[in-house]
């Protein structure tokens, strides 16, 4: 799926995807609002305990849902600190070539990503 930008678009796309004859047993969403739409669709279809879900980036209340939403959490403080360091180096006259800095992520297991596939 592509060109989905909000929770309602995600909800509709996930509903369509899960209505197929051979629906997926797991979903990975790449943005918070898409994850929220996926949660809505799974709950409405009563599949929240049958289809695994892992989202990229944490969001408020992810742990309060049932099951809690498993996410790949970013570290925004480390990202900001790294960006600021590179910016201030450049402002200070650094002529180093562009570089890639990797900021580690963390898998936060809350239950939704650990749902085992089931046969229909």
Predicted regions and their residues:
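Hinge/beta->alpha junction and helix N-cap segments in small-molecule ligand-binding domains
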Residues: 1-13, 26-36, 56-60, 73-82, ...
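Alpha-helical structural signal in soluble globular domains
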Residues: 11, 16, 37-45
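Surface-exposed charged/polar residues within alpha-helices that form helix-capping/stabilizing sites
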Residues: 16-19, 89
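Short helix-capping segments at alpha-helix termini
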Residues: 20-22, 43-49
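Hinge/cleft segment of the Venus flytrap/periplasmic-binding protein
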Residues: 49, 76-120
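Glycine-rich, charge-decorated loop segments at or immediately adjacent to ligand/cofactor-binding or catalytic sites
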Residues: 62-67
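A short acidic/histidine/glycine-rich donor-binding loop in glycosyltransferase catalytic cores
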Residues: 69-71
